Amino acid sequence: MSFRLILDIQDQMNIVRRLHRSARLGSDLVSGFKLKCGLELHTQLKTDFKLFSLSKTSFNEPPNSSISYFDVGLPGTMPKLNPEALRLALRLAVSLDSDINLNSSFDRKHYFYPDQPLGYQITQHYSPIATGGFLKLDSRYDGIESTKKDIRIEQIQLEQDTGKTNYVKFDGEVRIDYNRANIPLIELVTKPDFETIGEVVAFIKKYQTLVKYLDVCTGDLETGAIRVDVNVSVNGGNRVEIKNLGSTSEVAEALGYEYRRQIECLKENVSILQETRSWDGKSTTASRSKEDALDYRYVPDSELPVIRLHSDIKKQVQESLPQLPDAVVEKLIASPFNIELKHAQFLVNNKHVLSYYYNLIESIKDIDVKRANNWLFHEVFGAFSKNNLAFDPDKISPSSLARLLHLIFIEKSITSASAKILLGHLVTAPNSMEIEQAMEQYDLGKPTGVSESDIDEIVDEICTEIIAANPDVIKRIKDGKHKSINYLIGQAMKETEGKVSSDIFAARFKALIGT
């Protein structure tokens, strides 16, 4: 090791110590120090079988229970491409407006590591499945500072995932689970177009939404379905790679730290080494320098034929794609839906709920869409949330919710208060029920067999008793604090178990109080 390199390393260690002593690093940019960043995203594809074998893709099975001879590199086994992986890669590439390579091929990336039993990884180094394209960021939806920005794609390639290495500290053993080996991955490489940390985080979140929406991947960073490598440089200097970041918060923190570390190096006139670094939750640490970089000795894989695609393939895939997330959001926030942006984005991120919403809107008749929106997003989802339950459309189908809204607003046979109570019963019931059946079982419909005059008399009696019992509230109302009447209405609704409309009580209280 050269004397100069030793000095550089010592200087960088001093810088790291100063960074640790300083306050927690933020993500703000520093004037005069331009951030330049690119991403590599490794995305596990949602296929039933692995990339080059008939083993099931499995993430929850016991270790080494979902493997084939090829997955563990036994001699004499041959790879055979899973066409479903190719189909999903094409869906993603076309959605990003990438150029499809009509003659792509596979290569061997040679390195030795226990989680790669073949001694090489099958990837697409020379002729990837797609190149070019972009993902558009928009300040309206993505929270970036620029109005709009296209993040360009360098390339998209198919490759194998590796096995999973587990280091067991207490007995000093290294255990390898090959269930993950040969699971199909897409590696997507961007151009170094990111200039702020916010843009990086926005891109990753938008990419997650896209792959989930297209059913290409589960989109989870926490489980490793998407793994992120970040390439960072400041003022056009040497590029540093930070590998295997597992969440957007990790990406933001690691990128913020590395950006400021490089600024400190530049201020101190210390060389920034071109290297790979790891993030430990507090700082980035060197793991491999350019001098230690492996020679992967890429060679074409002679056991796999060239993938030859028809010249119309991009058009064919495009015709099979659904409307993409940004277009869906724009549609949902406009008439006739008029959904709030946050709710529209929630629907796009949860495609099964989006389908539920469309079915609900198709089912309602003579009911304002705004009312349907309010009941779905606030009352229905709220009922599941209050009971710590995930949304389950089997508990209350779109047609059942439409029927409930009709009973509230058209037939007026159940009050809003009673309907909210009914929702609580429906979401916790062991079996689904028809709306009328549930109303009868829980006695939540409006009183039947009672004349209008009888109801008026009951309302008068209840309101009079409540007014007499709450002189302080009456005084506040007469002094101009008109919202205090809501307390009285709440007491009346409780007295009638929600079976009489709050509007009736409101009108009667106002008449009796004289407001």
Swiss-Prot record:
Q: What does this protein do?
A: Allows the formation of correctly charged Gln-tRNA(Gln) through the transamidation of misacylated Glu-tRNA(Gln) in the mitochondria. The reaction takes place in the presence of glutamine and ATP through an activated gamma-phospho-Glu-tRNA(Gln).
Q: State the family it belongs to.
A: Belongs to the GatB/GatE family. GatB subfamily.
Report if keyword ATP-binding is assigned.
yes
Tell me what organism the protein belongs to: Meyerozyma guilliermondii (strain ATCC 6260 / CBS 566 / DSM 6381 / JCM 1539 / NBRC 10279 / NRRL Y-324) (Yeast)
Kindly give the Gene3D superfamilies that the UniProt entry links to this protein.
Answer: 1.10.10.410
Q: Which UniProt keywords apply?
A: ATP-binding, Ligase, Mitochondrion, Nucleotide-binding, Protein biosynthesis
> Which Gene Ontology CC terms are recorded?
glutamyl-tRNA(Gln) amidotransferase complex; mitochondrion
Enumerate the subcellular locations listed in this protein's record, separating them with semicolons: Mitochondrion
Q: Which PANTHER family match?
A: GLUTAMYL-TRNA GLN AMIDOTRANSFERASE SUBUNIT B MITOCHONDRIAL AND PROKARYOTIC PET112-RELATED (PTHR11659), GLUTAMYL-TRNA(GLN) AMIDOTRANSFERASE SUBUNIT B, MITOCHONDRIAL (PTHR11659:SF0)
Primary gene name: PET112
The organism's superkingdom is given as Eukaryota
User: Between which residues do disulfide bridges form?
Assistant: none
Q: What is this protein called?
A: Glutamyl-tRNA(Gln) amidotransferase subunit B, mitochondrial
GO MF term set: ATP binding; glutaminyl-tRNA synthase (glutamine-hydrolyzing) activity
Any other noteworthy remark? This protein may be expected to contain an N-terminal transit peptide but none has been predicted.
The reaction(s) catalysed by this protein are:
L-glutamyl-tRNA(Gln) + L-glutamine + ATP + H2O = L-glutaminyl-tRNA(Gln) + L-glutamate + ADP + phosphate + H(+)
Q: What is its EC number?
A: 6.3.5.-
Q: Which GO terms describe its biological process?
A: glutaminyl-tRNAGln biosynthesis via transamidation; mitochondrial translation
Keyword Protein transport assigned to the entry: answer is: no
Which EC class is this protein assigned?
A: ligase
Main location as per UniProt: mitochondrion
Subunit text: Subunit of the heterotrimeric GatFAB amidotransferase (AdT) complex, composed of A, B and F subunits.
